Amino acid sequence: MTPQALHANWNAAWQALGVAAPDDALRLELQRRYGEPQRHYHTMQHLGECLAWFDREQALAERPGEVALALWFHDAIYDVHAHDNEACSADWARQALQAAGASGAAAERVHALVMATRHDAVPEGRDAELLIDIDLSILGAERARFDEYERQVHAEYGFVPEEIRLPRRRAILQRFLARPAIYATPRLHALLEARARENLQRSIAA
């Protein structure tokens, strides 16, 4: 996604909430976070891919501005040694929305959307379903991009010994494969489900 497209998405998201976009400092700080050196997958590449999906499918959202901002913040805090990244990112999102003058209800909904990216429960509501489907769209990517994604994830956890890391990674992929459906929205299910299952099966068998 081009810098111009990122800027346009950012401004449109705030406008949809009925508030002016904060000055560029917040957006640039988020982009700086996604460029941190410990990241290999959870980068501006991932954020740009997510926002590109959102731009194409935003008609599926009930509150599109909130979904877009949840995407911007969903990996804002990313420490591979921590277990509260989503909670910290969600708290930052809520604080940013409150500071910009968004309603308390909107801030809480965005907080909940970011927390849903823990992928530990079935998403509830159209916006959560769309957000999670977009976050998981990489599983249904073309083979070359999926394989790149797997390399990127392994690079982020390169400090974990391979004999521990590989079985853990297979177990995570197995859990996605075991779901009755990986994607909740009919649109993304139709576009990505079959290829996601092919990618997961191939990676698990490797």
Please place each PLM-identified region on the residue numbering.
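Short runs of predominantly hydrophobic/aromatic residues within well-ordered alpha helices
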Residues: 27, 47, 64-69, 110, ...
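Divalent metal-dependent phosphate-bond-processing catalytic cores, especially two-metal-ion Mg2+/Mn2+ enzymes
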Residues: 1-16, 35-42, 52-61, 73, ...
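Short, flexible active-site-proximal loops enriched in glycine and acidic residues
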Residues: 60-66, 82-85, 102-106
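Short, well-structured alpha-helical segments
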Residues: 23-31, 44, 68, 107-115
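Active-site metal-coordination segments of metallo-dependent hydrolases
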Residues: 36-46, 78-91
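An amphipathic alpha-helix signature
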Residues: 7, 11, 27-28, 51, ...
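His-Asp-centered metal-binding catalytic motifs of divalent-metal-dependent phosphohydrolases/nucleases
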Residues: 50, 64-80, 89, 112-118
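Histidine- and acidic-residue-rich, metal-dependent catalytic cores
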Residues: 33, 89-121
